[in-house]
């Protein structure tokens, strides 16, 4: 009987790294592979990965951005320690391949894999490559990317996303029977985006007879943002305010348009369902979210509003100049940019390059 192949996944820190990696892991599990995970104890993967039935091991590593001089001076020691911890785990687990999908854990894990002779397959989720992935690309056996701008010669495969997003009805079917108020979904991510939470209620007050709104405000913000809607005179039966949304596929499919940040996973989830967006990119020196948003905006599937330019006037102007015919055209373009076989393609590359 042939021995089962094993993949070590290195991904952590944010949902943008962890969820695409889970999608690939689940695909390979169906192909008979064993999966183990390398993460850190204090980030989201520590709770999330075991919930999906995947065993996880931990190394000690954290980012250096914003740290003091003491942390910077100790960084070489901390990195060497993390590499040795990862090497010990790799020698014990004996994976046939390692998949790096971002987060602090990927750096030491990738170096340790190279030292152990295990092939490293890298996937960059964003339109701009993170520093860790830039370094790892020099030792990786294969480099894959979601968008065509991160690496000059890497294969573009899209971002692996949950399959339930692709099972939603196509835009033509969803929009066919829609009449009445435009459906606006506001999503700030798991933490809520403060700028959206503070701007949208004022916009809603000026379009109360034109919009139906679902607003996900993040943990601990429902009471405050509900009060803000009430203060602006925008609170009504057509406004639903929640901390979190459990079924994002259904929420995206319900919406005529989404107002949100433009993390890589969000952009690819919207494309998977085929839902237009108004993106408000998070401000970052490398313009990562802006370039993610351009992937859909450049084909007419989304609008971009820079955070410095965001106010109620801008949102009112955008929404009053969009009708369902235009929104359907945007939705169709978004769907055309989706990558339904991203998880499968990443898995195929792993299988092709495994020891």
UniProtKB/Swiss-Prot annotation:
For the ligand (UDP-N-acetyl-alpha-D-glucosamine), the binding residues are 14-16, 126, 162, 190, 245, 264-269, 289
GO biological process: one example:
regulation of cell shape
> Which key words tag this protein in UniProt?
Cell cycle, Cell division, Cell inner membrane, Cell membrane, Cell shape, Cell wall biogenesis/degradation, Glycosyltransferase, Membrane, Peptidoglycan synthesis, Transferase
Entries under Pfam families matching the protein: Glyco_tran_28_C, Glyco_transf_28
Q: Where located?
A: Cell inner membrane
Membrane topology of the entry: Peripheral membrane protein
User: Which SUPFAM superfamilies does UniProt cross-reference here?
Assistant: UDP-Glycosyltransferase/glycogen phosphorylase
According to the UniProt record, one GO cellular component term is: plasma membrane
Q: What is its EC number?
A: 2.4.1.227
Q: Which reaction does it catalyse?
A: di-trans,octa-cis-undecaprenyl diphospho-N-acetyl-alpha-D-muramoyl-L-alanyl-D-glutamyl-meso-2,6-diaminopimeloyl-D-alanyl-D-alanine + UDP-N-acetyl-alpha-D-glucosamine = di-trans,octa-cis-undecaprenyl diphospho-[N-acetyl-alpha-D-glucosaminyl-(1->4)]-N-acetyl-alpha-D-muramoyl-L-alanyl-D-glutamyl-meso-2,6-diaminopimeloyl-D-alanyl-D-alanine + UDP + H(+)
Instruction: Cite the annotated pathway.
Output: Cell wall biogenesis; peptidoglycan biosynthesis
The protein's predominant localisation is membrane
Q: EC class of this enzyme?
A: transferase
GO MF term set: UDP-N-acetyl-D-glucosamine:N-acetylmuramoyl-L-alanyl-D-glutamyl-meso-2,6-diaminopimelyl-D-alanyl-D-alanine-diphosphoundecaprenol 4-beta-N-acetylglucosaminlytransferase activity; undecaprenyldiphospho-muramoylpentapeptide beta-N-acetylglucosaminyltransferase activity
Which protein family is named in the record?
Belongs to the glycosyltransferase 28 family. MurG subfamily.
Q: Which PANTHER family match?
A: GLYCOSYLTRANSFERASE, UDP-N-ACETYLGLUCOSAMINE--N-ACETYLMURAMYL-(PENTAPEPTIDE) PYROPHOSPHORYL-UNDECAPRENOL N-ACETYLGLUCOSAMINE TRANSFERASE 1
Function, please? Cell wall formation. Catalyzes the transfer of a GlcNAc subunit on undecaprenyl-pyrophosphoryl-MurNAc-pentapeptide (lipid intermediate I) to form undecaprenyl-pyrophosphoryl-MurNAc-(pentapeptide)GlcNAc (lipid intermediate II).
Put simply, this protein is called UDP-N-acetylglucosamine--N-acetylmuramyl-(pentapeptide) pyrophosphoryl-undecaprenol N-acetylglucosamine transferase
Organismal lineage: Bacteria, Pseudomonadati, Pseudomonadota, Gammaproteobacteria, Pasteurellales
